[in-house]
Amino acid sequence: MTKRKHKEPILQSRYDELHRKNEEALTGGGAKRIEQQHAKGKLTARERVQLLMDEGTFEELGKFVMHRATDFGLDKEHYLGDGVITGYGKVNGRLVYVFSQDFTVFGGSLSETHAEKIVKIMELAMKNGAPIIG
């Protein structure tokens, strides 16, 4: 997402907030956890999706979703996307829906909103008669 300048200050502040949230969502569980994945020779969920999809076709859904859990101190830890990358795009020119669980966020563990994102992608795939990859 490239930064833009708006004439209206309110639009600029909203755009800046969207840009900040987008950048935050792209980092998953943070730079340290991404480095740990790379040190093990593994790709992140986002990197796997980008490799799979035809260039420039992936549209992410639910990028800003966060979990609602409060037990075990989770009310103090929030990551945008809630540990799963979901969306659609093309593979070899064919529409597909994808989800990829992000180990950098809570070890890729399943929360209520995490599961809801996967179910939404499955429903969209069925509705549109397209395959799902997860």
Q: Residue locations for each model-derived region?
A:
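Terminal-region recognition feature
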Residues: 1-134
